[in-house]
Curated annotation (Swiss-Prot):
UniProt name for this protein: Sensory transduction protein LytR
Function: Member of the two-component regulatory system LytR/LytS that probably regulates genes involved in cell wall metabolism.
UniProt entry tagged with the keyword Repeat: no
Lineage of producing organism: Bacteria, Bacillati, Bacillota, Bacilli, Lactobacillales
The Response regulatory domain, residue ranges: 2-118
Record domain HTH LytTR-type: where: 140-244
Subcellular location: Cytoplasm
Amino acid sequence: MNILILDDEMLARQELTFLIQQSKELDHPDIFEAEDISSAEKILFRQQIDLIFLDISLSEENGFTLANQLEQLAHPPLVVFATAYDHYAVKAFESNAADYILKPFEQGRVDKALAKVKKIQHLSTIDETATTEKKGMELLTLTLADRSIVLKMPDIVAASIEDGELTVSTKNTSYTIKKTLNWFKTRAKTNYFLQIHRNTVVNLEMIQEIQPWFNHTLLLVMVNGEKFPVGRSYMKELNAHLTL
């Protein structure tokens, strides 16, 4: 498991690193440390992080800022808030945190948080394995100002966010609604949809052409003529799906 600890206090990072390494819940975890959000973002760009221990009251920053950004990742890590203050607990769990632990850290409490994370990951794996794909029956309803549109999921070419609005496109048309990309992703639970940029999810079966792009990335040309650049942090997963 890859774990990131974000805390502006070096001693707190060292203490939590030690307790995680001592825990019997994990076998040789890889632990990364960051003292601010910028450093954490760089690690998230380079590594697939499974779990973040996230302090809330950072010097001149707030841990919720990073927590809100994680939804844009292809595979968001689980979050355990690790802070000295208990009054953030409600907001933390509203942010879908896996757990919330208080300083000073205790081995037993860290073990409990890690066990909870493992259980969440296990249940998620079971759910994905048990899901039988029914491409012809999957539908997406888009509520417009004057009517609702029902689309078959396999007919969708892409979904992208721009200026806070979600555009869902098909071969012949597109629809723009006030939804988030995460809203679409939770409804596109099939292996032919893949996030290729923080703003874009595409239907892999609707890719018509792949072109080289800037900084050793790619540009996807879809069957309807739309073109989408692939973000650098999404290249590895795209290559795996397309066996490039």
